[in-house]
């Protein structure tokens, strides 16, 4: 049988839903719906969030809520899920209230226009009826938002079964395993009883079986848990409170014991002296009077509350007693004048001339403000409802229609909350009572008001005159117009315009830096090749010794050596290598210009070109011999030949150069270590990635080899199957023909047998 779930909610189902939500929470709707036979999880969830939830407001709609609802419906049309939390109601309540406001105003307008009258008006559904929007034969679509139906006296069997099952499941606080737990408990009880019966029978037979007792300082690992630490009962440590309770209990026990001993001593003394009276039965612990204790606690609470109250500090009065007396006298004078005029025959004429000073106008609004209908105007709710009806009746202006003329006023579009217009009522105006004279019917302050009005008019005239003077100082407008033919810019004009443009500071700075860098490059190019290549320069300059050691019979060679020594000394002094200090003096060789350097190069090329090939070969041979002779000496350091005449100079030079070389070697070693560490830091990630890629490639290669083997096997199988397929097909066809023949013979036999019968 198919069971259709749904329908109106009953009181029993609501109560089951409340209890289920309190136990299972607001997320397990499938489990909750299993308790309700006729409801789905979606319906249970909707019922909770639309009706049963305690946070849902079911009171009458206030004016502020109506204004907020209409304002949000105007800003967010048909977005009721978004509007509901802002208004503080459910989405269904907001929609129903919105429709009700529109229906009420529409019915009111129809009644005013006379569209509903006579029998039609009496037959029409009431406005407040929630079912008036339903047609005949239609069902309520939102049954979850309606009150629950009362339970029937005679429930159906399925309802009774549902109720009993829900009661049993909700009463089960031990979870789904309650039956198994009860069964295990019964089995444990049976096992214990059987064990006792067994011990009793063995004891009757003379066999005593004692329970195992643990020896001292030993542990039974089968019965206890080693190194067990029991967790705390709660979130906080209450050991100190337990100790304090134990101490208090022990002191109370001691007092009871002492009181009992004293009573026994007094009883024995009374018996000794013969005037013993039977003591009254008293309790061991004196019971306090409950009412007196409650009264005492109440007084303590009141005293504590009184101590919490602060002293009332009122501000000082703004109106003195003299001013109050003057106001009272003015009121009495007006009352006396009115009483005197009322006694005369023509009291009406004089009464109209006198003001009434008994009723004081207040700056605060009344408790019951005047509604818009009493003032002859419509309130914001009615205006918004009428505007919404007009929007619903007409097409939107986005479809090409004219804009709908809406009624001005309402809640506006300034924000999420509706905006209220300023109240024009004199009773609610905050400045309706001007300071000391709330009413001036007798024109007591007419002179002061007139003087103030004249002063303000005079100030306005002065301000207007000053404004006119300032406007007169403005230059007169020129209305000379001249039409010119547009002229397109030529290339020359573009170049002129570009030249006129001011150069940017960043471009100028970059241009200056480039110019300085170019000058430095040209200056470095004019220096020697040792400086350009940043080669090592000597740290000690001794031009005279160098000249003596390199003197030659050829005057041309001597000139060249002299220039070379001067250039080496100048480079060592003017451009020291690194941060080393150079010992010795030398004359600075001036830098040559670019033209002079180019001229020298041309002369060298010309001179070298004039040399014959044999001379050039001889020159190269002599150069190599000289170079090898200088660098293959027995001395530890090259270049010490110049110190052969002086042993002390040789020893000092060796020591100096040795220390410098060792220091440079140590420095270079540190730099190399730093560079190696830096290179390792930079390359480590790449090295790890390389290893990872190598492993990945190896795995991929193995997988590729495996797939190739599989492909070869499958191709071989394919070829074998393709070759064997015709044979198998032929065998199957032969088998089929045999089966057909056998079946034909069987049919003939069957026909023959049936024909004979």
Swiss-Prot record:
Entry's family note: Belongs to the CEF1 family.
DNA-binding region: 29-52, 80-102
Biased composition (Basic and acidic residues): 271-307
Classification via InterPro entries: CDC5L/Cef1 (IPR047242), Cdc5p/Cef1_C (IPR021786), Homeodomain-like_sf (IPR009057), Myb_dom (IPR017930), SANT/Myb (IPR001005), SANT_CDC5L_II (IPR047240)
GO BP: mRNA cis splicing, via spliceosome; mRNA splicing, via spliceosome
Lineage: superkingdom: Eukaryota
UniProt protein name: Pre-mRNA-splicing factor cdc5
Sequence ranges assigned to domain HTH myb-type in this UniProt record: 1-56, 57-106
Region (Disordered): 271-319
PROSITE patterns: HTH_MYB (PS51294)
Gene that specifies this protein: cdc5
One Pfam match: Myb_Cef
Molecular function terms, GO-annotated: DNA binding
UniProt lineage: Eukaryota, Fungi, Dikarya, Ascomycota, Taphrinomycotina
Subcellular location, record wording: Nucleus
GO CC terms, sorted: cytosol; nucleolar peripheral inclusion body; nucleus; post-mRNA release spliceosomal complex; Prp19 complex; spliceosomal complex
């Amino acid at each position: 049988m198919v069971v259709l779930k749904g329908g109106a909610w009953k009181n029993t189902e609501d109560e089951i839903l409340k209890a289920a939500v309190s136990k299972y929470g607001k997320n397990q709707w499938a489990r909750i719906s299993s308790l309700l036979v006729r409801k789905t999880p979606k319906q249970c969830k909707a019922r909770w969030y639309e009706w049963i939830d305690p946070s849902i407001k079911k009171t009458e709609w206030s004016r502020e809520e109506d204004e907020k609802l209409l304002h949000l419906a105007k800003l967010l049309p048909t977005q009721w899920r978004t509007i509901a939390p802002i208004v503080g109601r459910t989405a269904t309540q907001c929609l129903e209230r919105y429709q009700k406001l529109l229906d009420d105003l529409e019915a009111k307008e129809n009644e005013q226009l006379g569209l509903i009258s006579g029998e039609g008006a009496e037959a029409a559904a009431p406005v407040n009826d929630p079912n008036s929007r339903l047609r005949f034969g239609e069902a309520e679509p939102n049954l979850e938002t309606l009150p629950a139906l009362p339970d029937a006296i005679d429930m159906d069997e399925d309802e009774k079964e549902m109720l009993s099952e829900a009661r049993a499941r909700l009463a089960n606080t031990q979870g789904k395993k309650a039956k198994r737990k009860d069964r295990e408990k019964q089995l444990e009880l049976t096992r214990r009883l059987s064990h006792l019966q067994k011990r009793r029978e063995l004891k009757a037979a003379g066999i005593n079986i004692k329970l195992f007792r643990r020896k001292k300082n030993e542990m039974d690992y089968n019965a206890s848990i080693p190194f067990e630490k029991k967790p705390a009962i709660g979130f906080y440590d209450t050991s100190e409170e337990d100790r304090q309770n134990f101490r208090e209990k022990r002191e109370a026990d001691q007092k009871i014991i002492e009181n009992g001993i004293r009573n026994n001593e007094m009883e024995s003394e009374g018996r000794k002296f013969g005037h013993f009276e039977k003591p009254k039965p008293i309790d061991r612990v004196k019971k306090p009077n409950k009412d007196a204790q409650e009264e005492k606690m109440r007084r303590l609470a009141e005293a504590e509350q009184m101590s919490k109250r602060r002293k009332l500090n009122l501000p000082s009065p703004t109106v003195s007693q003299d001013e109050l007396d003057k106001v009272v006298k003015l009121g009495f004078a007006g009352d006396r004048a009115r009483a005197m005029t009322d006694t005369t025959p023509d009291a009406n004429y004089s009464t109209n001339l006198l003001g009434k000073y008994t009723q004081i106008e207040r700056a605060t609004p009344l408790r019951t403000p005047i509604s818009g209908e009493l003032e002859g105007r419509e309130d914001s709710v009615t205006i918004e409802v009428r505007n919404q009806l007009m929007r619903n009746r007409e097409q939107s202006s986005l479809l090409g229609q004219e804009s709908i003329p809406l009624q001005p006023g309402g809640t506006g579009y300034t924000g999420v909350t509706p905006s209220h217009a300023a109240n024009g009522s004199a009773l609610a105006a905050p400045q309706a009572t001007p300071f000391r004279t709330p009413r001036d019917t007798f024109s007591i302050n007419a002179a002061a008001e007139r003087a103030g009005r004249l002063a303000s008019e005079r100030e306005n005239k002065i301000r207007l005159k000053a404004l006119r003077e300032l406007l007169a100082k403005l230059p007169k407008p020129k209305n000379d117009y001249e039409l010119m033919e547009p002229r397109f810019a030529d290339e020359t004009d573009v170049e002129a315009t570009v030249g006129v443009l001011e150069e940017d500071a960043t471009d100028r700075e970059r241009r200056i830096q480039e110019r300085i860098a170019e000058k430095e490059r040209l200056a470095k190019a004019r220096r020697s090749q040792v400086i350009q290549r940043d080669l090592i320069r000597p740290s000690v300059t001794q031009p005279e010794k160098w000249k003596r050691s390199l003197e030659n019979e050829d005057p041309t060679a001597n000139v060249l050596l002299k220039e070379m020594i001067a250039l080496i000394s100048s480079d060592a002094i003017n451009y020291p290598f690194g941060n080393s200090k150079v010992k010795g003096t030398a004359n600075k060789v001036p830098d040559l210009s670019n033209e002079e350097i180019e001229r020298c190069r041309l002369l060298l090329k010309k001179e070298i070109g004039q040399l014959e090939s044999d001379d050039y070969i001889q020159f190269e041979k002599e150069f190599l011999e000289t170079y090898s002779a200088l660098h293959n000496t027995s001395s530890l350091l090259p270049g010490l030949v110049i110190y052969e005449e002086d042993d002390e100079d040789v020893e000092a030079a060796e020591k100096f150069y040795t220390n410098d070389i060792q220091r440079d070697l140590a420095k270079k070693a540190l730099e190399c270590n730093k560079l190696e560490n830096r290179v390792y830091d930079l390359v480590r990630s790449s090295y790890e990635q390389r290893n990872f890629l190598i492993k990945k490639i190896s795995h991929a290669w193995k997988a590729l080899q495996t797939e190739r083997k599989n492909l070869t096997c499958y191709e071989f199988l394919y070829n074998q199957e393709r070759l064997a397929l015709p044979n198998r097909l032929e065998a199957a066809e032969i088998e089929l023909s045999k089966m057909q023949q056998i079946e034909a013979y069987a049919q003939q036999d069957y026909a023959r047998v049936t024909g004979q019968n």
